[in-house]
Amino acid sequence: MADTIVDAVSRALDEAPGRNFRETVDLAVNLRDLDLNDPSKRVDESIVLPSGTGQDTQIVVFATGETALRAEDAADEVLGPDELEDFGDDTDAAKDLADETDFFVAEAGLMQDIGRYLGTVLGPRGKMPTPLQPDDDVVETVNRMKNTVQLRSRDRRTFHTRVGADDMTPDEIAENIDVIVRRLEATLEKGPLNIDSVYVKTTMGPSVEVPA
């Protein structure tokens, strides 16, 4: 991991005005030379951060039986088929659920009903559930997703993502940034040439450029 990333994070933390609340540390990525009107060129990646997100990640699991029981120890909420059907009759409640939840996980057998009752709400938000296969451990899946962020550019050249909190060390935050930048370089059409600039900042602090 380049020392320049650590230096940029340290500056962002040092230059942030003192606050009496815990601040998020965010990354802004500016893209270039991409036709983002073409959906295939857009960024849409889930990335597990090695140092964690530094924030609470809200995860809802759709499950039944033993899987639902196990999920109760890990997820923020566990919903069954009856609750799922109720959301189909209450669009406002469905939208609230989607807006308050970072990630959804669902047993594969429930995916069809989720598409039926919640697809029009979750789909446009990019929040359709991660399907659980029979051999998947729901607790492991939920715990992994607690450290996951979603990179999504849509049709805009600039997008943001959470990379930590201001009480994490510069090295921890820099490690998260390094993983994100490497993933982008590996998946973008022209690799690093498609990245115009990268900035890191706390919620209320100034932006500091992360050198290439």
Curated annotation (Swiss-Prot):
Keyword set includes Glycoprotein: no
Glycoprotein listed as a keyword: no
GO cellular component: large ribosomal subunit
Keywords (A to Z) from UniProt: Repressor, Ribonucleoprotein, Ribosomal protein, RNA-binding, rRNA-binding, Translation regulation, tRNA-binding
GO biological process: regulation of translation; translation
Record field: transmembrane: none
Classification via Pfam families: Ribosomal_L1
GO MF annotation: an example: structural constituent of ribosome
Xref: InterPro entries: Ribosomal_uL1, Ribosomal_uL1-like, Ribosomal_uL1/biogenesis, Ribosomal_uL1_3-a/b-sand, Ribosomal_uL1_arc, Ribosomal_uL1_CS
Role of this protein: Binds directly to 23S rRNA. Probably involved in E site tRNA release. Protein L1 is also a translational repressor protein, it controls the translation of its operon by binding to its mRNA.
Family per similarity comment: Belongs to the universal ribosomal protein uL1 family.
NCBIfam families on file: PRK04203.1
Subunit note: Part of the 50S ribosomal subunit.
Protein name: Large ribosomal subunit protein uL1
Organism per entry: Haloferax volcanii (strain ATCC 29605 / DSM 3757 / JCM 8879 / NBRC 14742 / NCIMB 2012 / VKM B-1768 / DS2) (Halobacterium volcanii)
Source lineage: Archaea, Methanobacteriati, Methanobacteriota, Stenosarchaea group, Halobacteria
Encoding gene per record: rpl1
